[in-house]
Regions:
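Conserved S-adenosyl-L-methionine
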Residues: 172-180
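Short alpha-helix
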Residues: 149-171
Length: 180
């Protein structure tokens, strides 16, 4: 899908936000494995990444503060986050993540996440429960034994409208399009 929407002709560097250390699943770092035509790959992750595909790796949360040196080292033409924004915690942290991605981008930012109102929640595989108000959803997840996912800091799904509202705050910095 991304290759059909983005012109990669002048993309020379790539930044993967939220890289996982897990390389055992086909979905792990899926996009990074498919962008081998881009010369320089960079990574930001709160995990320790041992992967020789990356030119630069910064072990840091994407919601943190970045020094000018870190920004200069990691700034890339194409910055992508695949299934990360729902794991950074609060709405404020989600905003901070996007703000940092803008600072780290020369040209293009892609944020991929599951829509909160997709019928099956992909982390728990439970249908429709996540349609409930977030507070009730979290209580039920905890009762069902999904304590990790019941905490906002570990899972905070966004609806189309919530994502749009975050992006509207950056209209003076970026042009954006949301695909459903």
């Amino acid at each position: 899908f991304i290759k059909s929407k983005v012109n990669f002709k002048n993309i020379n560097s790539y930044l993967d936000v939220g890289t996982t250390e897990d390389e055992h699943h086909e979905s792990s770092n899926y996009l990074n494995k498919r962008f081998d035509f881009i010369k320089k790959h960079n990574s930001i992750s709160d995990q320790k990444i041992k992967n020789n595909r990356f030119s630069n790796i910064l072990q840091k949360t994407i919601t943190g503060n970045f020094s000018q040196n870190e920004i200069d080292t990691l700034r890339s033409d194409f910055v992508i986050s695949n299934a990360t924004i729902e794991h950074v915690g609060s709405f404020d942290n989600q905003e901070k993540m996007i703000d940092n991605m803008i600072k780290l981008s020369n040209k293009i930012i892609v944020i991929q996440t599951i829509n909160r109102f997709f019928p099956i929640e992909t982390h728990t595989k439970l249908p429709f429960l996540h349609f409930l108000p977030k507070k009730i959803h979290r209580i039920i997840l905890k009762i069902l034994g999904y304590k990790y996912y019941s905490l906002e800091e570990n899972l905070n799904l966004l609806s189309y409208y919530e994502m749009r509202n975050i992006l509207k705050k950056f209209e003076n910095k970026i042009d954006y399009k949301i695909y459903r």
